[in-house]
Amino acid sequence: MSSTDTAARTASDSAALRAELDITKLHALPSEQQDLYLLTFTSDLVQHISGLEKPQVSAQQKFLKKELFKILTLSSPTITRVVRNNLGRCFGAIFSKGDRGILFETVTDLLGLLNAGKHEELKTKFAAAHCLGEVFAAAGESVFAQAGAVISSLLKLLKNASNHTGFRGSIFAVLRKVVVGVGIPVDESAARDIWKQARNAATGDKSTFVQVHACRCLEQLLNTTPFFDNANDFDHVKTVTLKVIDSPAAPVRHAAAACLARALAKLHATEAAVAPMPKSKKAKRQSKKPAPRPGEDEEEAEVSESSASKRPESRLFFLLPDLLRQLSTQYSRSGTSNRARAGIAVCYKHVLRTLGVKFVQERYGEIAGHLLFDLLNHPAVTYNRFRLLMTRKFVKSILEDTVGLESLREDSQLNAARWLINGVLKDYPQVIQERREPSKYTLTSTLSALSSLISSLGSAFTALAEPCRDALLQVLPHPSYTVRIHAAHCLRSFVLACPHQLLSCVTIALNSLNREIGQLSTPRQAPRRCVGYANGLSAMLSTSRLQPLYGSVEVYSRVFAQATDLLKTSSNSELRAASTQIQVAWILIGGLMPLGPSFVKIHLSQLMLLWKNALPKHLGKENFAQRGNLEMSFLAHVRECALGSLLVFLEFNSKLVTADGARRIATMLQNTVGFLDDLPKQKSVTDISQRLHPSLQLHDLTTMVQRRVLQCFSKLIHVHPLSHGDVISQTSLLSLAISSFAEPDSTQSGPLESSITASTAQFETLWDLSDNFAFGLTGLAREYVHVTLSGRHQNDNGPAWSAVESADQAIDDSVSFENAL
């Protein structure tokens, strides 16, 4: 035993000798090498302490403290951020691993450096303050008696740090660690002093670093002390955070959102906690105050409203509806910027995370109802197209990511899906007069949330298969295109999770489609209903290749025959009815293309003939002179539909594309380019009777055809690389691509565009032009935008340009992309 002790003591002594700083050697080095020497020494010291056992740390505490203070009091070189962080790690490791015999002495010595006169350099005080924060984070409960003195000294240093941004921010970071580390609420006067300084810094300081740490300091005061749970202080923190949340910097928005979320979550109370208040009713009867106007009582719910109360400040509580309304009211104000809305969306997420998993599971219906009905349907949101899309994205992130994936488990996910089906989808169309029909905005986000839950549950969703199938098929023919597409996507997720429902869903949708096609000549909304059923069928049929055991070749052949019959009989129909028949036929054919070469090969010759007929060689500009706007729109519409199915064919059947087939497809695409080149540049048509679709002009359809042509060209080149030279040399692909975004007259000038051009300073972004494509900018560039903003590719797990990537990056990206425009 004695030999072992001697060996351990020898190893300990040698380690101590290696950890000793040689100041003479340090100062003998050239000035440019002194920083590197000090950095290397402190890094080695961190590794040395991390490798020691608890008894070894206790044995070396005094020596290590001496070495650390030797570095803190160096006149040169300057203590950099990395060295400062290393010193803090050393102090934290010493008191978290070893005993705390020298803890009081260490805090006193660090306080002495903080309180030193002007003769002590600011960098030394900066390092001492940082080390104090690490000491309190590791062992603050053992020195809570000194917390008041430390807080007082740190607040005094704020005045001296007016010209040092990093020091100001670090002071608030240290104050936060002191408040958290002591383990008990700090003195109220000290807390009030921190509260005042942090509020002023959050709103008055221009540094984002200081603002972030000031907001985090406020958040910890709200979390660990009971002094600010009243109406007056809540109004103060709400005013501060809503002002800061409009910052262009995402970290500042997140810090302000977390602070406001902490305040709201701490003031949250269940009905059980608020209900038993008999005295408040009596006081309310005796009150002579006028009744509040509608909406004023929505701001807050106080437990006691008695004016005769002797307490100067009443305890404040929020029920869940009032708590959520605090956020939605501010979000829906017309003066709230999009950056502030993004911050409020992050605040929603923080509130739900703070309330806890169990609470969110129990109150999913109220939370989802607030977001889907109250927030999405507010006039301030629906009035502005970009604001609506942004809000839909925020609701998607909150409901699907924060709630659906983070909080809900399998049972609660099933309950949530049941609520979405019974509480929203089954109310369309309206059946009971007392239950309002959900708007298209509500239905869109509901279908998106349900699709996410179905994908997460997988085969466990079978318990809700029947009601879900009926609800989705009921929503599928909705008048809104957005709702129809989301319903089709949800049906795709549904049949993937419940493959035994595939054939029944396809059969029901196909029968409904045949019924609606027979009523195309009637005044009811049959065209939209037909396209809705076709999109649903296409989405469901495309899943057959993933689960072939549940499909049926007979059904596939029946659908293909139905599509070809529609193309053949469309020539006998009226123009608008024919356009619907053609669109439905090509959508169905596109849905069959994912079945792969085994099915498509049988019908390949017939498909090539159909595409050739739909994409013929154009006869020239003289031919257009005899056609009106309606007929030209029809020709563009036919080409866009045919190109859509051709694109899906190239995606899933590349093995069938031979060199001859590639040339034939390239010829069809070149024919379409010629058609686009000869289309006349017409202005917007106000006569609805001359439009193929009420909401689409001819130039809108032209843009859609251009998109499909470029997509098909791009896919063809990737599918058959040997045709690169032929495609580029024999077609005008490059001129089409360049003219799509470089041609000055590519956009058609209408009354709205002309008025905007005359007042260019009155709109914020290109989205306000309402030209449906923001002057050619497209979401297809999202990968480039993502790399530009975050510094990493989509599937890259390496470090990004930013050391800390936000957990709510989707919300930040939406605001960053808008600012880029």
How would you name each of these model-derived features?
Residues 2-55, 69-70, 74, 815-817:
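N-terminal "cap/leader" segments of large eukaryotic alpha-helical scaffolds
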Residues 11, 15, 50-61, 95-104, ...:
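Flexible loop/turn segments at the boundaries of HEAT repeats in alpha-solenoid HEAT proteins
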Residues 15-21, 58-75, 100-120, 147-163, ...:
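Amphipathic alpha-helical segments within extended alpha-helical solenoids and repeat-rich scaffolds
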Residues 33, 56, 75, 79, ...:
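Structural signature of alpha-solenoid helical repeat scaffolds
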Residues 33-36, 40, 308-342, 346-425, ...:
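Long, compositionally biased acidic/polar linker segments
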Residues 34-52, 79-90, 121-135, 164-179, ...:
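HEAT-repeat alpha-solenoid elements in large eukaryotic scaffold proteins
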Residues 59-105, 382, 386-408, 412, ...:
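Helix-rich alpha-solenoid scaffolding regions
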Residues 76-147:
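A generic tandem-repeat structural signature
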